[in-house]
Amino acid sequence: MRRLQLILSAVYVFGCAFRCAFPVYDVPRICLFDHWLSSVIVGRSVATVAELCFVAQWALMLHEISRATRSMVGRVASLAVVPLIAIAESCSWYSVLTTSNLGHVAEESIWGLCVALLVASVVAISPRCAAHRRPMLLGWCVAGMAYVVFMYCVDVPMYWARWLADEAAGRRYLSIVQGVLDVASRRVVSHRWADWKNEVAWMSLYFSVAVWISISLIHTPQPEAHLATGERRRLPSAGPLRIASLDKRRA
């Protein structure tokens, strides 16, 4: 599991590093550099792959721990989050191509839902986890709930307000084909704070906190190490030597 976590994290960290170097404000096609690497189609493609890898890290970790703790809630959530985020990415592409922010409303709502599912899963498995692991689980829950609040109180309303403003102004949206041609060729270079200020909050968190979370998932202990001693003894594969090894590692 750790090798796969390393690969997934490497892809996500690379994607964030790339998007830090070539930031793009997708719908209005705003970028910092007049270079093909700053095109929306490149930036959005990198983001799609990176974000799927990031959520796959969480799904993998949650699936392994849920299997060890026999948590049905966690197991279902671990199987649901990647397909849900794939749908969210499709909504994002719809918004990017058509310039309609309604797709971003759906995208961010799904992200909030997925993180809420992850938090609920961690809450469900925490009673079966060792006491010294619970502060870490609590930290994940607090961070997750802060993210959910941010998404539904800040991010989703922001995109909803943009869509309403576009509707009131009678904006004409692009077709999918027109959008593909547009994101591949049009770049609006801007260094004005007014153009970027609404993007700063999520970009700052996304390219810092989320990166460290991704890296930390590589170092998550083996699933059995999360369990309380009594729970480990009930595992079918946990023989005396294995339990002793886990207890020694815990000490």
Q: Which residues fall in each region the model found?
A:
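Membrane-interfacial loop-to-transmembrane alpha-helix junctions, especially the N-terminal start
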Residues: 1-11, 68-82, 131-141
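Aromatic-anchored segments of alpha-helical transmembrane domains
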Residues: 12-18, 82-94, 144-153
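Helix-loop junctions on the outward
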Residues: 14-42, 96
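Internal transmembrane alpha-helix with an interfacial aromatic "cap," most often the third helix
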Residues: 23-27, 45-78, 86-96, 119-127
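Short aromatic-rich membrane-water interface segments that cap or initiate transmembrane helices
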Residues: 34-49, 190-200
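Hydrophobic alpha-helical transmembrane segments of integral membrane proteins
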Residues: 81-104, 230-250
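Short helix-loop boundary/capping segments
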Residues: 84-140
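C-terminal transmembrane-bundle signature of multipass membrane proteins
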Residues: 119-246
